[in-house]
């Protein structure tokens, strides 16, 4: 029988529900259980693919091409699993599917309502996440805060799950805040009490409380919270701020959270062996070297827009005992006149993905600086496209080289709309998305980065591609096309072998990086940046 764990949040948002859920998933996996995890987002968008990075942060892409919440990146990195379309469910997706069924006549003339039709669809998504992966445990995080009107159908579905699958197969975890009032010198439990009261008013009695605190909670305070919220004192789990996220699974384990969960779910498993994880935590806390990377992008005001890139850079740094210090540069503010002063002193330059014409010329200036000064460069998606345009302009002499994304009628579109995108009308969910194979050129820098593999599988998210009309012309000037689709039609990787490291990929390598298994291109880039 599949077991279900539901993680909700109260008092305020951004308490770290996603990290708690991911940490618990890691603990249960290390107990020998097969775990899957999903995020419910209460917004009306079908997915975050068309949302501004300033509002939502990064759009994380799964193997099957689903555009998802950035929390799925945390899940994949912490638990080291690959997720799917059932791992991110939005209100928009639920309503869209229910309305399609209604139009087909699937409800046989019934009045379609939130209960039971919407809640049944939500429960179907929960159960499907388990059956499609054959998981022992499904962990479901509900976005937002208890009390939000948008979350009510999801919470009602969670309430119904208890009677549907049996109380012995369900655990409810509620994350709350115990604030410290500096003026009074006291910690206050009242917000937690009220949050749990509101959750109980919706029919859900939490089994475990994870309380976010600034200072340690005393045993007497733990007892007080337990008494007012009707949980066992040992089920009140303290979650203090930490210097590295990798401490959180170990902190939860030290408070027996995974043991409490397994006992409630009648799961007889050995204790989680977290030796390797503890070693990772210790390494991260004691890095001796430093590598300075300049990240040049369009959305740098919100670093969460590049969170997987940031994490992938850090993962590669752990391998060489180096802290990767990332400084952000707004590409709109970089010019031919100031780029050298701005980027001087950095060990490497990276230009990640993005959309639209804003800030492209600044990216091109950063790429030119890296190429001409032999500073290690890694381009991702848009960063690969701009690298091709910079090379075409400044090396091949095609002065008006550009992208069809800026000017669809330009004479020299080095980057152009993919043929199968020309008749696409809807913007959402229609890009080239998900895992695709890439054939690597033997002896290339890219091939070496991946252990001389012939073919790799990487995740994509793009609508434009390199225009093959210019492949021979740029190759004659020294640009190596070191990665292509197996049929050789789509350019996936370009490089300049004369430079210390100048590699750019159309795909998004950051989505497959793990803290204990860095992604190949990122590792090669950081090695070159560190002079290894």
Curated annotation (Swiss-Prot):
Q: GO biological process: any one?
A: pyrimidine nucleobase biosynthetic process
Query: Does the record's keyword annotation contain DNA-binding?
Result: no
* A single GO molecular function term of this UniProt record: glutaminase activity
Q: Where does ATP bind?
A: 14-19, 71
Q: Which residues form the active site?
A: 381, 508, 510
- What is known about regulation of its activity? Allosterically activated by GTP, when glutamine is the substrate; GTP has no effect on the reaction when ammonia is the substrate. The allosteric effector GTP functions by stabilizing the protein conformation that binds the tetrahedral intermediate(s) formed during glutamine hydrolysis. Inhibited by the product CTP, via allosteric rather than competitive inhibition.
Query: Where do the annotations place UTP binding?
Result: 13, 188-193, 224
Identify the metabolic or biological route this protein is part of: Pyrimidine metabolism; CTP biosynthesis via de novo pathway; CTP from UDP: step 2/2
Q: Name one Pfam family in it.
A: GATase
Recorded E.C. number(s)?
A: 6.3.4.2
UniProt signal peptide: none
Superkingdom of the organism of origin: Bacteria
Binding residues for CTP, per the UniProt record?
13, 148-150, 188-193, 224
Q: What class of enzyme is it?
A: ligase
Q: Which reaction does it catalyse?
A: UTP + L-glutamine + ATP + H2O = CTP + L-glutamate + ADP + phosphate + 2 H(+); L-glutamine + H2O = L-glutamate + NH4(+); UTP + NH4(+) + ATP = CTP + ADP + phosphate + 2 H(+)
Membrane spanning residue stretches = none
| Domain Glutamine amidotransferase type-1: start-end pairs | 292-532
Q: Which residues bind Mg(2+)?
A: 71, 141
Family as reported in the entry's similarity comment? Belongs to the CTP synthase family.
The record describes its quaternary structure and partners as: Homotetramer.
NCBIfam families per record: PRK05380.1 (NF003792), PyrG (TIGR00337)
For this entry, the protein name equals CTP synthase
**Origin species:** Ligilactobacillus salivarius (strain UCC118) (Lactobacillus salivarius)
């Amino acid at each position: 029988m599949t077991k279900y764990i539901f993680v909700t949040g109260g008092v305020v948002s951004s308490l770290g529900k996603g990290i708690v859920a991911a940490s618990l998933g890691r603990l249960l996996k290390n107990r020998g259980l097969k775990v899957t995890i999903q995020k419910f987002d209460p917004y009306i968008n079908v997915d975050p693919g068309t949302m501004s990075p300033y509002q939502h942060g990064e759009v994380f892409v799964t193997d099957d091409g689903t555009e998802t919440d950035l929390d799925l990146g945390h899940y994949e990195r912490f638990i080291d699993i690959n997720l799917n379309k059932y791992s991110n469910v939005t209100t928009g997706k639920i309503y869209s599917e229910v309305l399609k069924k209604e139009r087909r006549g699937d409800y046989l003339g019934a009045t379609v309502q939130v209960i039971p039709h919407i809640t049944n669809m939500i429960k179907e998504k929960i159960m499907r996440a388990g059956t499609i992966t054959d998981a022992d445990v499904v962990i479901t995080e509900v976005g937002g805060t208890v009390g939000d009107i948008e979350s009510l159908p999801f919470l009602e579905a969670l309430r119904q799950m208890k009677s549907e699958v049996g109380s012995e197969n369900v655990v409810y975890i509620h994350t709350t805040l115990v604030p410290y009032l500096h003026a009074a010198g006291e910690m206050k439990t009242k917000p937690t009490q009220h949050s749990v009261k509101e959750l109980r008013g919706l029919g859900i009695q939490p089994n475990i409380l994870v309380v976010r605190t600034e200072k340690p909670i005393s045993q007497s305070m733990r007892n007080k919270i337990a008494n007012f919220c009707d949980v066992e004192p040992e089920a009140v789990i303290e979650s203090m701020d930490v210097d590295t996220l990798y401490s959180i699974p170990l902190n939860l384990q030290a408070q027996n959270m995974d043991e409490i969960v397994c006992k409630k779910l009648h799961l007889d498993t050995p204790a989680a062996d977290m030796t390797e994880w503890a070693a990772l935590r210790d390494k991260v806390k004691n890095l001796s070297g430093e590598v300075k990377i300049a990240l040049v992008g369009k959305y740098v005001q919100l670093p969460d827009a590049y969170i997987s890139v940031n994490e992938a850079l850090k993962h590669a740094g752990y391998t060489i005992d180096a802290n990767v210090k990332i400084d952000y540069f707004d590409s709109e503010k970089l010019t031919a006149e100031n780029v050298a002063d701005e980027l001087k002193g950095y060990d490497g330059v990276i230009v990640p993905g993005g959309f639209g014409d804003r800030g492209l010329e600044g990216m091109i200036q950063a790429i030119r600086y890296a190429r001409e000064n032999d500073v290690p460069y890694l381009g991702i998606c848009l960063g690969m496209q701009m690298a091709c345009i910079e090379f075409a302009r400044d090396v091949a002499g095609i002065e008006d080289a550009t992208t069809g994304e800026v000017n669809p009628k330009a004479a020299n579109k080095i980057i152009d709309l993919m043929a199968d995108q020309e008749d696409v009308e809807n913007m959402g969910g229609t890009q080239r998305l998900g895992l695709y194979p890439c054939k690597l050129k033997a002896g290339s820098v890219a091939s070496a980065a991946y252990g001389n593999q012939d073919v790799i599988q990487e995740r994509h998210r793009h609508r434009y591609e390199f225009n093959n009309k210019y492949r021979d012309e740029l190759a004659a000037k020294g640009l190596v096309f070191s990665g292509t689709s197996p049929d050789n039609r789509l350019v996936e990787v370009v490089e300049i072998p004369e430079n210390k490291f100048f590699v750019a990929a159309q795909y998004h390598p950051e989505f497959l990086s793990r803290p204990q298994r860095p992604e190949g291109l990122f590792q090669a880039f950081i090695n070159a940046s560190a002079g290894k």
